[in-house]
UniProtKB/Swiss-Prot annotation:
Designated name of the protein: Serine--tRNA ligase
Subunit structure as annotated in this protein's UniProt entry: Homodimer. The tRNA molecule binds across the dimer.
Gene3D superfamilies linked: Bira Bifunctional Protein, Domain 2 (3.30.930.10), Serine-tRNA synthetase, tRNA binding domain (1.10.287.40)
One GO process term, biological-process aspect: seryl-tRNA aminoacylation
Family affiliation: Belongs to the class-II aminoacyl-tRNA synthetase family. Type-1 seryl-tRNA synthetase subfamily.
Molecular function terms from GO: ATP binding; serine-tRNA ligase activity
Gene: serS
Binding site for L-serine: T231, A232, E233, E285, S385
Domain of life: Bacteria
EC number: 6.1.1.11
Keywords, ordered alphabetically: Aminoacyl-tRNA synthetase, ATP-binding, Cytoplasm, Ligase, Nucleotide-binding, Protein biosynthesis
GO cellular component: cytoplasm
Residues where ATP binds: R262, S263, E264, E349, I350, S351, S352
Taxonomic path: Bacteria, Pseudomonadati, Pseudomonadota, Alphaproteobacteria, Hyphomicrobiales
Organism for this UniProt entry: Rhizobium meliloti (strain 1021) (Ensifer meliloti)
Its biological purpose: Catalyzes the attachment of serine to tRNA(Ser). Is also able to aminoacylate tRNA(Sec) with serine, to form the misacylated tRNA L-seryl-tRNA(Sec), which will be further converted into selenocysteinyl-tRNA(Sec).
């Protein structure tokens, strides 16, 4: 959420930032709404002050035995008391209206983010590794998995409907191995603290990270009003909500391997075959909580941590700097890691690493206090995939396919597979 004080002082900057995101200017309407809020609040405070003053004057009038003045003051106090509930309700209503309007405004992009309307304007930042050179025809992951008898989409559809997958045998073990490898890497070498967070969260948590109120259609809600998490970013980031942290102990770095649940409401007709776009999938998430001065450097560090997963798996990928029109709602800058999938003859996103500034912290009221500073500041938050297990599995299956249809297990995963080096069709 953006600060209304900043908007009042930087109206042109806000409208320019919104234009870069392809949105209409909003500063004038927001400032007008804020002026109404301030006027209503001032009127309410004036009424409260006059009620309090008149109440004191009644005592003075009674002491002077001026019953006429005392009666007038009593009538005035009674009128003010009767009028105050409506004034308080109007103040609450306009405060909520402004808060709702602010909650729907996307974050402002950093100055070095490329300007563009959609993914076609994203910029290749670097390319790592090389595409595999084969003699055999590349196959898509679902063709390989079904041929091995270890990937079942029809069975999943009978149980749960479309966009679900059943993994069996050594493919199920391979996905588990990927998750264990990623957690060991991030906790053992990258300094992240492993967390097992709730998978169900309240409205406030979704609001804090920016999924609500604007993106409820992308989420699954339970009958008791809780939400299934679309990413572990939600519970991990909300671990610091309503807290004042010790600035000397920042950054905090958290990681979690969780199922994620998404309705894919806007994805009709896209990636309908296979497990690229699922209602339920597993993902390792990275979250950092930093001070205001360190978040840009932390963004580069987090991206490097996610890249290390792909490097150790021996996968070819590229890093994209997303343009203003393709960035997420809460991001100030985002790097996407796109892994090469031979079966699709395309790069596909496998990780997205974003720096959010104090955008989420304002929604969560998460602050820190520096050692030499008076008062508090909002923390800065960052999040990234470290990485999505299903897409990592797809990349391994397609890139490590052998001529005979078997899959070579990447060296780094062999210890997690009990020494198994090749996945073959079961007899």
């Amino acid at each position: 959420m953006l600060d209304i004080k900043w908007i009042r002082e930087n109206a042109d900057a806000l409208d320019e930032a919104l234009a870069k995101r392809g949105a209409e200017p909003l500063s004038a309407s927001l400032i007008a709404l804020d002026e109404r809020r301030r006027a209503v609040l001032q009127s309410l405070q004036d009424m409260q002050s006059r009620r309090n003053a008149a109440s004191k004057e009644i005592g003075a009038a009674m002491a002077q035995k001026n019953s006429e003045l005392a009666d007038r003051l009593k009538a005035e106090v009674a009128d003010l008391k009767n009028a105050l509930p409506a004034a308080e309700e109007e103040s609450r209503r306009i405060e909520a209206e402004l808060s709702d309007a602010l909650s729907r405004i996307p974050n402002t992009p950093l100055a070095d983010v490329p300007v563009g309307a959609d993914e076609s304007a994203n910029v290749v930042t670097r390319v790592v590794g090389a595409k595999p050179g084969w003699n055999h025809k590349p196959l898509e992951h679902f063709e390989i998995g079904e041929a091995l008898g270890l990937m079942d989409f029809e069975g999943a559809a009978r149980i749960a409907g479309s966009r679900f997958t059943i993994l069996k045998g050594q493919l199920a073990r391979l996905e588990r191995a990927l998750g264990q490898f990623m957690l060991d890497l991030h906790t053992g070498e990258h300094g992240y603290i492993e967390v097992q967070p709730p998978l169900l969260v309240r409205d406030d948590a979704m609001y804090g990270t920016g999924q609500l109120p604007k993106f409820s259609d992308d989420l699954f809600r339970t009958t008791d009003g809780r939400w299934l998490i679309p990413t572990a970013e939600v519970p991990l980031t909300n671990m610091v909500r309503e807290q004042i942290l010790d600035g000397e102990k920042l950054p905090l770095r958290f990681t979690a391997l969780t199922p994620c649940f998404r309705s894919e409401a806007g994805s009709a007709g896209r990636d309908t075959r296979g497990m690229l776009r699922q209602h339920q999938f597993n993902k390792v998430e990275l979250v950092s909580i930093t001070d205001a001065e360190s978040s840009i450097d932390e963004h580069e560090r987090m991206t490097a941590c996610a890249e290390e997963v792909l490097k150790r798996l021996g996968l070819h990928y590229r890093v994209m700097t997303l343009c203003t029109g393709d960035m997420g709602f809460g991001a100030r800058k985002t790097y996407d890691l796109e892994v090469w999938l031979p079966g699709q003859d395309a790069y596909r996103e496998i990780s997205s690493c974003s720096v959010c500034g104090d955008f989420q912290a304002r929604r969560m009221n998460a602050r820190y206090r520096g050692k030499e500073e008076k008062g508090t500041k909002f923390v800065h938050t960052l999040n990234g995939s470290g990485v999505a297990l299903g897409r990592a599995l797809i990349a391994v299956i397609e890139n490590y396919l052998n001529d005979d249809g078997s899959i070579t297990v990447p060296d780094v995963l062999v210890p997690y597979m009990g020494g198994l080096r090749r996945i073959e069709k079961s007899a």
